[in-house]
């Protein structure tokens, strides 16, 4: 493998770490509209709060709940993302990664909707795990 990180892998690592630092400095409430919330009511673009908004299908994948959460996701992104990007090229790699993030988000929305409609608690989903597990799957194949 090359000694330098491929550009998209490097950009994803930097973006995730930078956003985690911002989360730590500004507090979690600032980023609530960007976490993935289950659908609990009607879409309201003027009151994002704790309800699903379409942009959350991408933004949740760049937020993390703790330093350990961030470190393990970024380690896996480095380990599996760099070789895949070198094999596929940056465009295909980024498209695949983002499709995995959105796909995992859609699955989580379905589970969250079921949980909330069954009387379960409303909670946000954050983290790059959906994208990372997609990379792990591709790497393993």
Regions found by a protein language model. Name each.
Residues 1-2:
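Cytosolic juxtamembrane amphipathic/interface segments immediately preceding
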Residues 5-126:
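N-terminal TM1-TM2 helical hairpin plus the immediately adjacent luminal interfacial "cap"
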Residues 121-141:
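Membrane-interface micro-motifs in multi-pass membrane enzymes
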């Amino acid at each position: 493998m090359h000694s330098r990180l491929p550009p998209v892998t490097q950009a994803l690592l930097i973006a995730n770490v930078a956003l985690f630092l911002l989360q730590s400095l500004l507090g979690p409430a600032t980023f609530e509209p960007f976490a993935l919330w289950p659908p609990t009511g009607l879409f309201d673009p003027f009151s994002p709060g704790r309800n699903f908004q379409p942009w959350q299908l991408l933004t949740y994948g760049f937020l993390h709940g703790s330093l350990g959460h961030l470190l393990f996701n970024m380690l896996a992104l480095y380990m599996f993302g760099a070789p895949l990007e070198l094999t596929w090229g940056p465009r295909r790699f980024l498209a695949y990664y983002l499709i995995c993030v959105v796909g995992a988000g859609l699955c989580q929305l379905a589970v969250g909707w079921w949980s909330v409609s069954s009387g379960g608690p409303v909670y946000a989903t954050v983290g790059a795990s959906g994208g990372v597990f997609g990379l792990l799957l591709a790497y393993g194949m």
